[in-house]
């Protein structure tokens, strides 16, 4: 089920490099320092974050640009959250940045695809356990990632994967 869709467009030249300090998280800053085209990187990350908050339907209300980061996997941006934003376990992300930065973020709630390790009897009491995989137990839950992670850790269990969302510290 699609939870939200956000899009943002901005002119790359209008985004100053000093903007990096305000909008980039620590991992994004490390990526930024390796880039030759830094202005495009900042504009792209700003557009992605604006699109993300639009997809949430909240705007920045009560949130900070550094609460989310867009890291990279195989050259593509991947969402990393640093706090709970509600329930979605997939983020589909697209970014283009040449003269304009254009970002699209689609947040989706898929059944299952949340993998945990731990005591089977505890997991079956608390969640709908779908199946056992090589990675661990696949469960169904409506708990957002940090709430789930805290509950699991307090019970000696561990969150292995939360869809395609990276969970920051």
UniProtKB/Swiss-Prot annotation:
Pfam entry (one): ACPS
UniProt cross-references to InterPro entries, sorted A to Z: 4-PPantetheinyl_Trfase_dom, 4-PPantetheinyl_Trfase_dom_sf, ACPS, Ppantetheine-prot_Trfase_dom
Cellular localisation: Cytoplasm
MF GO annotations: holo-[acyl-carrier-protein] synthase activity; magnesium ion binding
GO cellular component assignments: cytosol
Chief place where the protein resides: cytoplasm
The protein's required cofactors: Mg(2+)
Keyword Cell inner membrane among UniProt keywords: no
Annotated keywords: Cytoplasm, Fatty acid biosynthesis, Fatty acid metabolism, Lipid biosynthesis, Lipid metabolism, Magnesium, Metal-binding, Transferase
Catalytic reactions on record: apo-[ACP] + CoA = holo-[ACP] + adenosine 3',5'-bisphosphate + H(+)
Enzyme Commission number(s) from the entry: 2.7.8.7
Signal peptide range: none
Enzyme class at the top of the EC tree: transferase
Domain of life: Bacteria
Binding residue positions for Mg(2+): 8, 50
GO biological process, one term: lysine biosynthetic process via aminoadipic acid
HAMAP family for the chain: AcpS
Summary of the function given for this chain in its UniProt record: Transfers the 4'-phosphopantetheine moiety from coenzyme A to a Ser of acyl-carrier-protein.
Family: Belongs to the P-Pant transferase superfamily. AcpS family.
Protein's name in the database: Holo-[acyl-carrier-protein] synthase
Gene behind this protein: acpS
């Amino acid at each position: 089920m699609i939870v939200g869709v956000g899009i943002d467009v901005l002119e790359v030249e209008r985004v100053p490099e000093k903007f990096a300090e305000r909008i980039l998280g620590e991992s994004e800053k490390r990526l930024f320092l390796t880039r030759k085209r830094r202005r495009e990187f900042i504009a792209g990350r700003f557009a992605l974050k604006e699109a993300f908050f639009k997809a949430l339907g909240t705007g920045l209300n009560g949130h900070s640009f550094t609460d989310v980061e867009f890291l990279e996997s195989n050259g593509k941006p991947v969402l990393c959250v640093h706090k709970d934003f509600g329930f979605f376990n997939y983020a589909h992300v697209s970014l283009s940045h040449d003269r304009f930065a254009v970002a699209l973020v689609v947040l989706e709630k898929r059944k299952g695809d949340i993998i945990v390790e731990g005591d089977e009897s505890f997991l079956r009491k608390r969640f709908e356990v779908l199946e056992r995989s090589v990675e661990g137990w696949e469960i169904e839950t409506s708990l957002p990632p940090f709430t789930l992670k805290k509950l699991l850790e307090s019970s000696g269990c561990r969150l292995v994967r939360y869809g395609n969302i990276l969970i920051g510290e």
